[in-house]
């Protein structure tokens, strides 16, 4: 069975709950580029937009840490808009092993830096799913919610603020999954931030 056909016949889950998102300070918490300006895990460049969130606040920040550290930037110096939202969505639940089996994919496919499989799973948009729920690539134990732009009206912002990452999140750095081809310079930056710890970040901000 082709992946698109498997998605069309996959079970649907009604997802209700609260999720966390962080993004640029200049945009509302529930906005995304549409069409997408660049590729992402569950979208290709030029496709309808996808908005990403995490089931935990630290999961949302972990995505920032993963990408900014890769660029050689200290993520604790970056200001972002972070917020909590309430969702009611029909999702393709890839955290469920039976659903993954139905699609013929495994967790390794979902976490890989090769987005070929996950971008193909975005066919769920054309099968009238609102979103994809999947294991998070950045922080083990968290879940990523990838919401297709047509379903953004089903997301209710509860609160948001512009801030730097809390210093306590320095404890997350050793837990974040690195990209598969992380340069040595990035590994050194990550090690420096980890050694500095939360208290050093607090002192730096005083």
Curated annotation (Swiss-Prot):
| Signal peptide region | none
Recite the UniProt keywords alphabetically.
NAD, Nucleotidyltransferase, Toxin-antitoxin system, Transferase
The catalysed reaction is: phosphate + NAD(+) = ADP-alpha-D-ribose 1''-phosphate + nicotinamide + H(+)
- Would the keyword Metal-binding be found if you checked this record's keyword annotation? no
EC assignment: 2.4.2.-
Q: Name one GO molecular function term.
A: nucleotidyltransferase activity
Q: Which SMART domains match?
A: RES
Transmembrane intervals: none
Q: What class of enzyme is it?
A: transferase
Q: What does this protein do?
A: Probable toxic component of a type II toxin-antitoxin (TA) system. Degrades NAD(+) by phosphorolysis. Neutralized by its cognate antitoxin Rv3188.
So what family is this one in?
Belongs to the MbcT/ParT/Res family.
Q: How does it assemble?
A: Forms a heterotetramer with cognate antitoxin Rv3188.
Task: Identify this protein by name.
Answer: Probable NAD(+) phosphorylase Rv3189
Which species is this record about?
A: Mycobacterium tuberculosis (strain ATCC 25618 / H37Rv)
């Amino acid at each position: 069975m082709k992946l698109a056909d498997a998605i069309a016949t996959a079970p649907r889950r009604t997802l209700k709950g609260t999720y966390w998102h962080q993004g640029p300070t200049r945009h509302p918490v529930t906005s995304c580029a549409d069409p997408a300006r660049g590729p992402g895990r569950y979208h290709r460049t030029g496709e309808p937009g996808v908005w990403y969130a995490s089931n935990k606040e630290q999961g949302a920040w972990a995505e920032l840490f993963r990408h900014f550290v890769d660029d050689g930037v200290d993520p604790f110096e970056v200001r972002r808009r972070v917020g909590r939202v309430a969702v009611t969505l029909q999702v393709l639940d890839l955290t469920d092993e039976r659903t993954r089996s139905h699609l013929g994919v495994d967790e390794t496919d979902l976490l890989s830096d090769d987005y070929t499989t996950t971008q193909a799973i975005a066919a769920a948009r054309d099968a009238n799913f609102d979103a994809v729920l999947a294991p998070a690539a950045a922080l083990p134990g968290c879940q990523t919610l990838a919401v297709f732009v047509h379903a953004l009206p089903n997301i209710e912002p509860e609160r948001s603020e512009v801030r730097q990452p809390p210093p306590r999140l320095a404890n997350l750095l050793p837990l974040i999954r690195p990209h598969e081809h992380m340069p040595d310079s990035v590994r050194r930056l990550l090690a420096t931030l980890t050694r500095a710890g939360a208290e050093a970040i607090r002192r730096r901000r005083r």
